[in-house]
Amino acid sequence: VELNLVIFNLGDSMYDAFEKTKEDNGAIYNKLENSYLQHKRQFTLFKRFEKESLFTLYMLNEGISRLKFKDPSRGNGTMQFLKAFADLGTKAALGEDSKSCLNVISGHTVLTCDDEVVPFVNGTHLIISLNSQKNNKDLPDSQYLKYYSRYIPGTFIDCKIYITDNFVENI
């Protein structure tokens, strides 16, 4: 059985909302800006990313929130959701040909996760790098992070998980 779930919020994209709070959220914003500058040095003629797309990726990581200046406990929910998806998707795919998939679509960015790129622990936080090295210092693989000319207002998270016999047995 194929299970499809969509969560959406219309309005500002993740990036646009984060940009609006950069003055109040200076420490977090500077952290993301520094990550972007490190990644930008790795750009080549054939592999480069828009700032919006990389910031969207960074914002998914645990401990990052556009509203952290208001509430220090924020910045965990989305990564916990991605981790739960990865765990469920792995259980579903054991011994099966079905492949679970999750997309985060926000603004111009489409970020895709599957069983090849899942959240992992880095220090005390869960992060996602979208690369096979599982290293947030390296650029993401371009098949998992894309920039589209069409703008999507808000954020959509859609996931597809297959409910299989293996899934039921491994819960």
Regions found by a protein language model. Give the residues of each.
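Short, well-ordered loop/turn elements at secondary-structure boundaries
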Residues: V1-L3, S98
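Short beta-strand element(s) in the Bergerat
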Residues: L3-L5, T155
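Glycine-rich acidic phosphate-binding loop
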Residues: F8-M14
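Flexible, glycine-/charge-rich segments associated with ATP-binding catalytic modules
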Residues: D16-I171
